[in-house]
């Protein structure tokens, strides 16, 4: 399975063109209820099989695990997408320095930028922060930036995309995108597709098998259980082998999607992801795609657009 590069507008030299369809999400390496050596073994297993990792210094002890794995196996260090956030450019720079020093690498291949506060205002006004981000790239600290999107920050990305400022800096958009979630609100998602901007989809399987999520007791606050119950009949109509197969085939078939970022804690789970990439099969069923996208449009209007910050 390969992405279709004709679906996006990217400079030939952009490092985003070198992304693999699947990026190993490292969050589970920070789960301290699992022995350190077990997590280290998982990191080595992923390094042997995956050319790209996604990580953050906010993922518990994930960076301790990765730092040791990178020291032990420097010839297999993957390219990395790092989460970067802050209300000022100085804060973003501090996070860059912190993470580079922690992992002992010289460059953040892709910086997934979450802007807030004064930085967000300056960013959308075409202010000095854009020159600061350009300088970071020119120094070789970051190969490319994408803008991280949540329902409560979609307006920032929408204003940025409409205004066109800093398009040379922000090369794509990173957000939850799987059969159960699409965190770019409807108007932003439509404009991203219209302008052929690259999408880095996050959270490949949306929290786990749809059957298990749908089987949870109904509770008003459990919106994922409700969504799973609505999606379950669509999933049942597919010929996919399992939920991983269904989720990856759906999202990687969508216009603009250049990779999917999925976390896993066991070698067997990672093998499930990689097995899907080896398939030679037609595109995802168009009828099922239309049904999923219709549900996501409805969910965006009903729930996502009203979501308080970090509530989902």
Tell where the protein language model's regions lie, with residue ranges.
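Active-site-proximal loop/turn and secondary-structure-junction residues that shape catalytic pockets
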Residues: 28, 57-61, 84-88, 112-117, ...
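Hydrophobic packing residues within well-ordered alpha-helices of enzyme cores
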Residues: 66-69, 156-161, 270-273
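Structured C-terminal cap/extension of enzyme domains
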Residues: 15, 37, 44-47, 72, ...
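Glycine/proline-rich, positively charged
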Residues: 33, 44, 48, 90-179, ...
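Aromatic/hydrophobic pocket-lining residues that form the small-molecule binding cavity
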Residues: 39, 66, 92, 126-129, ...
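Active-site mouth loops of central-metabolism enzymes
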Residues: 25-37, 81-91, 116-123, 231-241
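N-terminal binding-site loop/beta-alpha segment at the start of enzyme catalytic domains
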Residues: 1-78, 131-132, 138
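Hydrophobic faces of well-ordered beta-strands that scaffold small-molecule active sites
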Residues: 20-25, 51-55, 78-82, 108-113, ...
């Amino acid at each position: 399975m390969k992405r279709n590069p004709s679906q996006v507008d990217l400079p030939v030299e952009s490092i985003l063109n070198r992304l693999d369809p699947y990026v190993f999400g490292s969050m589970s390496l920070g789960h301290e209820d699992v022995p350190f050596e077990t997590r280290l073994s998982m990191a080595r297993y992923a390094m042997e099989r995956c050319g790209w990792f996604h990580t953050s210094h906010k993922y518990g002890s994930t960076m301790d695990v990765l730092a040791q794995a990178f020291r032990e196996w420097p010839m297999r260090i993957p390219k990395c997408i790092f989460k970067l956030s802050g209300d000022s450019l100085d804060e973003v720079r501090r996070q860059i320095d912190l993470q580079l020093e922690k992992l002992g690498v010289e460059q953040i291949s892709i910086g997934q930028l979450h802007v807030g506060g004064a930085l967000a205002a300056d960013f959308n006004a075409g202010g000095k922060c854009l020159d600061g981000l350009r300088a970071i790239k020119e120094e070789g600290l970051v190969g490319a930036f994408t803008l991280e999107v949540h329902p409560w920050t979609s307006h920032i990305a929408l204003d940025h995309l409409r205004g066109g400022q800093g398009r040379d800096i922000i090369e794509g958009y990173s957000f939850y995108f799987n059969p159960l979630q699409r965190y770019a609100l409807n108007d932003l998602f439509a404009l991203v597709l219209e302008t052929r901007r690259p999408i880095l989809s996050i959270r490949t399987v949306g929290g786990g098998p749809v059957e298990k999520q749908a089987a949870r007791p109904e509770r008003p606050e459990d919106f994922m259980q409700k969504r799973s119950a609505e999606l379950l009949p669509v999933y049942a109509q597919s010929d996919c082998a399992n939920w991983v197969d269904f989720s990856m085939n759906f999202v990687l078939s969508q216009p603009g999607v250049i990779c999917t970022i999925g976390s896993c804690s066991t070698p067997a789970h990672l093998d499930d992801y990689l097995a899907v990439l080896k398939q030679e099969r037609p595109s995802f069923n168009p009828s099922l795609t239309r049904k999923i996208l219709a549900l996501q449009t409805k969910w965006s209007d009903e729930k996502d657009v009203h979501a308080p910050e970090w509530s989902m």
